[in-house]
């Protein structure tokens, strides 16, 4: 039986793939052992996508947030610290709020350890715009065009 955390993660990956397939040439779901969760092909360029999904609310100073941690669940062989993603592992993070069915795309940044977004701000999010902005920051790619 699959645990709930794994189900939330897989649901997020499939939701991200759904959004990406509307605008990009192809999307490949990788296997569990890969550093990236999805490979995205857009305008003849491949991007590695790491999906982070949450189903819970983080409360801080009376406000409600969704929060994502950018560290994989793996530790160094000596258990000294969690391994961090590198630029060779990830091009884009896809941050999924499962309760809203929305995705925020952000380009990889070496300084990011976690990110939180107020729920009310996430509700207003335009997923397509966030993907377009992330791709533009990474590589000045052409505009996204949905299928008809």
Identify what each model region corresponds to:
Residues 1-34, 40-148:
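Mixed-charge (Asp/Glu-Lys/Arg
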